[in-house]
Amino acid sequence: MTLDERKRNILGSIIRDYVETAEPVGSRAMVKKHDLKISAATVRNEMADLEDMGYLEQPHTSAGRIPSERGFRYYVDCMMEKEPPGEREYALLQQLFEQNIEDWEQVILGIAHFLSQMTRYTSFVIVPAVKFTEFRNLQLLPLDQGKALLLLVCDMGVIMHRIISIPEFISSQDLQAITGLFNQAFIGKRLEEVKRSDLQLIRENLSQRRQIIDNALEAIDNLLQNSRDEKVMVSGALNILNEPEFKDMDKLKRILNVLEEDDSLRQIIPGELGEAVDIKIGRENPLEEIKEMSLVVAGYKSFGELGKIGVIGPVRMEYWKAVGTVETVRDIIEDYLKGLG
């Protein structure tokens, strides 16, 4: 149903005020706060119409109104203007990728923390398992003294990296020689196909450099093991304590149990996601425990697999800010991963 401009303005004002205060909104207060250019009596009549249409509700103890879930849905679908992060916040987000480029897991943790800090809701990032079949290339690149960057390139363009420790006497030429021997053993093979005798031969040929060989092998094993498992990162679960809707301890415990259990969290996140940010409001959510909450989630492409990123908060959510932030972070993640590929 399409609302006329006056009803849209009143509904939008009520939603903004209710999100800010968590209190029912009265007609007289609206006229004082907003330049609606109509009387309080006219606002009351319009609010009554919006209530009859299902967009507003009137709590029993108050003369004011609050938005219904249908009202929030109309606002999100037909009226909302997204608010992406400002220049300062955008720069901080870019720094997450630049400062932690050697450790993707730290980037993901930083993203989850950034989302929860920016929105003041609980954030989550789901990193999909990476599927690949064989090695394409391995590089050992010198960094600071006693450190090297191990780059492991697999099929489908997957690149994994890890900082490893190396003896201080190892030169760039030594790293090139070690890289050559590793590639002889690894290229075109799966990890399980690399024979123990091949690795032993590398260690024997580089007897003075066994420490770097062992460190590199350990790093490779860790990278591959981590890539096989889907990861769920959650940040800001206790932000829910700041919301007046969740002062009931039993209700709070049920919600926190969902947020802390990876399997429960997966149940509430849509399996398939398109280009647009997906928003689930209140009773649209599948689990009973979070039917008084809203979910904002976006998918991102990670080496052919679908990752997910989003926030969970009260139905009384700043959707404009949550959607703008999630969308921006999603785009930056995809740009970063495209650069790696």
Swiss-Prot record:
Keyword set, alphabetical order: Repressor, Stress response, Transcription, Transcription regulation
Domain of life: Bacteria
GO biological process: negative regulation of DNA-templated transcription
Alphabetized GO MF terms: DNA binding
Protein's UniProt keywords contain Transcription regulation: yes
Alphabetized Gene3D superfamilies for the sequence: 3.30.450.40, Heat-inducible transcription repressor hrca homolog, domain 3, Winged helix-like DNA-binding domain superfamily/Winged helix DNA-binding domain
Transmembrane segments: none
Keyword Transcription: yes
Any Pfam family hit: HrcA
S-S bridge residues: none
Entry-linked SUPFAM superfamilies: GAF domain-like, Winged helix' DNA-binding domain
Similarity comment: Belongs to the HrcA family.
Function: Negative regulator of class I heat shock genes (grpE-dnaK-dnaJ and groELS operons). Prevents heat-shock induction of these operons.
NCBIfam families: hrcA
Protein's recorded name: Heat-inducible transcription repressor HrcA
Taxonomic lineage from the root: Bacteria, Bacillati, Bacillota, Clostridia, Eubacteriales
Name of the coding gene: hrcA
